[in-house]
């Protein structure tokens, strides 16, 4: 794929064009401990997503503002996509916290969740806890109004996590030391993107 030719819905130069297709870290003088998602981490990320999607779909999520969350009838089971993961890793490997603009593939308009955790103790936060922080945003979600009427910065990771029409996920991760802060940065890309237009998070049962 020539990523320099991909025109993203949100515009901008594609991450895999701008930074090249290497996933090697490009973090200036920060000390990189490791980068990439291990097989175990990949399975954990997928399991947390699918268990949670299943829980919400079955109407078993009692949290919310107000709760509970209504059940869903069209929730896809997520599968891992290596291309999404690769593009997520290229971005994570820049050690720049934030969303990259253009990360679409020829197959998908791509959505994204990011998380970072830093500690002065020489330990790196477990990937599962980073993902669960997105899940916990459900506590602020009001299902009686549309997701667009909710306060996006409080619920946007949750809505992408359970966006029914999303089919595939791929994540990248990097662990580095920045001024004695032991930092774990996780980027997950989703296709097709959630939090999109005037669509609903999921169809209610």
Curated annotation (Swiss-Prot):
Its main location: secreted. It is found in: Secreted. Expressed by the venom gland. It comes from the Eukaryota. Pfam families: CAP. Keywords: Allergen, Disulfide bond, Secreted. GO terms for cellular component: extracellular region. The keyword Transmembrane does not apply. Gene3D superfamilies: CAP. Residues 46-190 form the SCP domain. PROSITE patterns: CRISP_1, CRISP_2. InterPro entries: Allrgn_V5/Tpx1_CS (IPR018244), CAP_dom (IPR014044), CAP_sf (IPR035940), CRISP-related (IPR001283), V5_allergen-like (IPR002413). Disulfide bonds join 4-17, 8-102, 27-95, 171-188. The keyword Secreted applies. Belongs to the CRISP family. Venom allergen 5-like subfamily. This is Venom allergen 5. It comes from Vespula squamosa.
């Amino acid at each position: 794929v020539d990523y320099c030719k991909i025109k993203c819905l949100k515009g901008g130069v594609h991450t895999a064009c701008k930074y090249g297709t290497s996933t090697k870290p490009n973090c200036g003088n920060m000390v990189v401990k490791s980068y990439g998602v291990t097989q175990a981490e990949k399975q954990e990320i997928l399991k947390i997503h699918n268990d949670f999607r299943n829980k919400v779909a079955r109407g078993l999520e009692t949290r919310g503002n107000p709760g509970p969350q209504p059940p869903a009838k069209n929730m896809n089971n997520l599968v891992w996509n290596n291309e999404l993961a690769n593009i997520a890793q290229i971005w994570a490997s820049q050690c720049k916290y934030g969303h990259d603009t253009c990360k679409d593939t020829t197959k998908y308009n791509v959505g994204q969740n990011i998380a970072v955790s830093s500690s002065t103790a020489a330990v790196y936060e477990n990937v599962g806890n980073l993902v669960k922080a997105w899940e916990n945003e459900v506590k602020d979600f009001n299902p009686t109004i549309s997701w667009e009427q909710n306060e996006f910065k409080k619920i946007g990771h949750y809505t992408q996590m359970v966006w029914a029409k999303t089919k595939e996920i791929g994540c990248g991760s990097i662990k580095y030391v920045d001024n004695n802060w032991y930092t774990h940065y996780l980027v997950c890309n989703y296709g097709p993107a959630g939090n999109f237009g005037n669509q609903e998070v999921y169809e209610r049962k």
